[in-house]
């Protein structure tokens, strides 16, 4: 029998990625929704009173699915409401830290750095994603001539750059320091393939172009097709800025050495995440020197499923 799943997210890109990765691995019959709670219910999610914000939402009516997978704080009231209205027949799954008691759900996955515990809780160091080795291989093949058109003496180094968030300023000075470190790699004959994210500041592009002006490199900064997956598939080595748990998790999937360019800032959650990564030899810091070691593909999606 085919399992029907409803996937409910808070609408953030990171939550959508994790939700789709798990739900699609479980079933092909999935319908996706954003919680879309209005004020004041959005402000009091994930607490029980926020279920009032789901009343009257005509999207969530019988027949109910076999499973509800929710991701993100604002998706909690929707999942709770569906469990109650289905008389418990919907198996409810929550991804990330529910903030409330995990026993409200049938199953909870949370990242280890969130310190969520319970008999129905599973944790992993990395988060789920929808990448597969076949996807990376296909993307790498289609981008090969654009990303690395000629024979090089060094390695193909993929650089994944994020941007500021509420924990890290990732200012001009830090970007200049990263660019200077990348220059050292270019001078050693390595091929640099750089991808910026939607959070990257506009001045990052100018800093990179000015610093690397005398060297051959590839830079994607939001225009045209995104080579992100191709970079993961083609790189011999990956460097990732330390502002995104999801981006670091995806970088750990191919099985090549991953180094993190750590940023100034403070977050207990991020710090615990980094401690787990370093202790498990998932990554090493990047300070201008490539470090090689035998890494292995890491895939939390399979573990969670």
Predicted regions and their residues:
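Extreme N-terminal starter segment of soluble prokaryotic enzymes
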Residues: 2-6
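Active-site and donor-binding regions of nucleotide-sugar-utilizing enzymes
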Residues: 7-129
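A nucleotide-sugar donor-handling region in carbohydrate enzymes
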Residues: 103-171, 286, 290-296
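Conserved catalytic-core segment of nucleotide-activated headgroup transferases in glycan assembly
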Residues: 164-195
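Donor nucleotide-activated moiety binding/catalytic core segment of transferases
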Residues: 208-246
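Conserved donor-binding/catalytic loop of nucleotide-activated donor transferases
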Residues: 233-235, 253-257
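Leloir-type glycosyltransferase catalytic cores
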Residues: 275-305
């Amino acid at each position: 029998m085919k399992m029907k799943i409803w996937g409910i997210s808070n609408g953030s890109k990171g939550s959508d990625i994790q939700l789709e990765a798990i739900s699609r691995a479980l079933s092909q019959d999935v319908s996706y929704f954003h919680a879309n709670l209005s004020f004041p219910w959005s402000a009091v999610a994930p607490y029980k009173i926020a279920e009032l914000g789901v009343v009257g939402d005509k999207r969530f009516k019988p027949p109910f699915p076999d499973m509800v997978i929710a991701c993100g704080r604002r998706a909690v009231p929707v999942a709770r409401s569906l469990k109650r209205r289905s008389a418990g027949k919907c198996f409810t799954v929550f991804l990330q830290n529910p903030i409330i008691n995990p026993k409200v759900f049938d199953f909870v996955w949370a990242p280890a750095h969130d310190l969520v515990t319970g008999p129905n809780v599973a944790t992993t160091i990395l988060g789920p994603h929808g990448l597969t080795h076949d996807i990376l291989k296909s993307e790498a093949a289609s981008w090969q001539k654009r990303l690395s058109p000629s024979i090089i003496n060094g390695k193909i180094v993929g650089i994944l750059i994020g941007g500021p968030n509420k924990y890290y300023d990732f200012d001009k000075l830090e970007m200049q320091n990263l660019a200077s470190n990348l220059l050292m790699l270019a001078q050693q004959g390595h091929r640099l393939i750089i991808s910026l994210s939607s959070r990257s500041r506009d001045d990052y592009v100018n800093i990179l172009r000015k610093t690397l002006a005398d060297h051959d490199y590839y830079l994607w900064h939001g225009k045209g097709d995104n080579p992100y997956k191709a970079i993961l598939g083609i790189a011999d080595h990956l460097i990732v800025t330390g502002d995104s748990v999801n981006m670091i998790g995806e970088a750990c999937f191919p099985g090549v050495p991953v180094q993190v360019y750590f940023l100034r800032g403070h977050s207990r959650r991020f710090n615990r995440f980094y401690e787990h990564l370093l202790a498990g030899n998932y990554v090493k810091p990047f300070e201008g020197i490539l470090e090689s070691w035998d890494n292995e593909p890491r895939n939390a999606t399979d573990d969670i499923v």
